Amino acid sequence: MSKHQKFYSNHSSRLQTWDYSKAGYYFVTMVVRNRRRSFGEIRDGVMHKTPLGEFAEQSWKRTTGLRPSMNIWLGDFVVMPDHFHAVLRIGVNEHNSSLSLHNELQTPGQVLFALSHPKNSFRPQSNNLASIIRGFKASVTTEARRTGVDFEWVSRYHESIIRNAGDLNFVRSYIQKNVKRWNG
């Protein structure tokens, strides 16, 4: 253990055996640093977005147009006061066709097979989930700086691989009810 490992954690929370350019459904959460409520506030069960919150929503909606070669589908998403949740699907495309299982939602057996056969090549992080998130976060950060808003994302993001229709339905329900459940 290096002398700094006990103070700093820089290991990835990503599933090491999964290729995030692979066709599949993903649930992502991005959080504003220090949980600052930069995107708005919730009053009486309704999210009232700031201009930056509105920009974040519009920026997310532009994702598919900015990356047409990735065959992205945007599912449910929600802008919350201090974070952002979204479901997206990366479809089979020119960047992942040799890696894909060619299934929208995979069976547990297919997922286990994919997890036991990790990719073993190093390459730049482009045309994958990380590049989508990086582009979105950069867009929102750039707008915040342009408009003088004191804003910063947490450097990482949380993701879950959605493995079946039950998981997808659970996540969709979670996102749809998020504003009503808010007790911030």
Pin down the residues of each PLM region.
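Short catalytic/metal-binding and nucleic-acid-binding patches
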Residues: M1-G184
